[in-house]
């Protein structure tokens, strides 16, 4: 299951009433236990001994009891990629209104009535995967998905839906409504990619997208590139693949601000987008470095470390920069360049060691794109 294109699907289920609890159980049973990480029920719905006993004996999900939605939703919002509420839509709207950040950052939000007759993908229908979750859960529990997104209603696949399938980002987001409106009005979008690889059959055979040659690039409404020009016409968006890996070396106790600053300056030197980052990579001696961990959280990318012996092997094989100071401190000739290369599958170093405030940064480019789309259905 990979609805968000990144493999990090985790769900929280929240219900208010006795009947809502029964519906929530049906949903929970239709999903793999690993993805439903939290299961909440209002304390009043557990007033009967039967409900309480059933909740404690559920082999898949341990019920957690709450008194007020406002006490749990802010944390769930930050920690889960999918939130499923079994309650009135108005209640959910009022609870989440102050938490909204943007369609590229908000979780998928679905709302069901307590009898499980209707499923509404309320928020993040495309980039968050709420629409496909609604459709597939409707099939599983015998409900009706209520989809209101214009492109979906007309049977069109919007560019941000393709972005979700591949785990790509959209820039600039404020151009997306204009481009989607063009798709609705014209029935077709022009697309150009700076990469030589061809996309998967589903996209190639989508009659609503016309792939352009280099000479017709200026006619594009969608460009696939990790190096977007954001001074662009409002009927153009970039789909940004995460193909730049950032290697970071640092002094102990470096601040998160210094790490973010160093990474940002390095990306700016390349004319790339922060959304093109696949992760922050370093040596395993830095696996507990708070500045690196928090910077990765802020940028919403993985943080991964490698053993020093692996870094040294890359340094020697690729003839990378060597530092006597680093060698004396941690036993390897360098960190950032080798770590950035190890963060790719078949990459090349495109920005050698760059020095910031207490950090060194290097960037490698993945030489191949993965066009394997996410599944159209849930494996449940």
What spans do the regions from the language model cover?
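Extreme N-terminal starter segment of soluble prokaryotic enzymes
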Residues: 7-13
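Short, basic, helix/turn surface patches
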Residues: 138-140, 171-180, 327-341
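Conserved mixed alpha/beta catalytic, RNA-binding, or beta-rich assembly cores of soluble enzyme
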Residues: 16-33, 46, 66-68, 78, ...
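Charge-patterned, long linear interaction tracts outside catalytic cores
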Residues: 358-380
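C-terminal non-catalytic interaction/assembly regions of soluble proteins
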Residues: 276-277, 281-340, 344-351, 355-359, ...
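General small-molecule cofactor/ligand-binding pocket signal
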Residues: 37, 146, 209-212, 302-306, ...
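N-terminal beta-loop-helix "entrance" segment that forms/cooperates
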Residues: 35-75, 289-290, 314-320
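Short, structured active-site "lid" loops
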Residues: 61-90, 296-303
